[in-house]
Amino acid sequence: MPRISQKPHRIAFGDRVRALRSDRGLSQEKLAELSGLHRTYVSSVERGERNIALDNIHQIADALDVPVTELFVTHAI
């Protein structure tokens, strides 16, 4: 499904969360558990559908054991 309605920065953020989660071998369910968020919320963040709150950004960063700034790093291909 195309992600036309999402903002590019939300998509980039979600892609980064997904990449970091996958690199750590975590499921969305486990990341949700570690961050205190619901799995469907984590899924919608990864798809770029959420305008995520700062508190939730910190919870995800803590769950992934990375600094918050690491969630905003993008790598050119």
Predicted regions located by residue number:
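A detector for short, charged/polar N-terminal pre-domain segments
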Residues: M1-A12
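Short basic helix-loop element that most often maps to the first helix and adjoining turn
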Residues: D15-L34, Q59
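Conserved hydrophobic/aromatic packing and binding residues within compact polymer-binding modules
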Residues: V17, L31-A32, V42-V45, L71
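Recognition helix of helix-turn-helix/homeodomain-like DNA-binding domains
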Residues: G36-R50
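DNA major-groove recognition helix of helix-turn-helix/homeodomain DNA-binding modules
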Residues: N56-E70
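Short amphipathic recognition helices of helix-turn-helix/homeodomain-type DNA-binding modules
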Residues: E70-I77
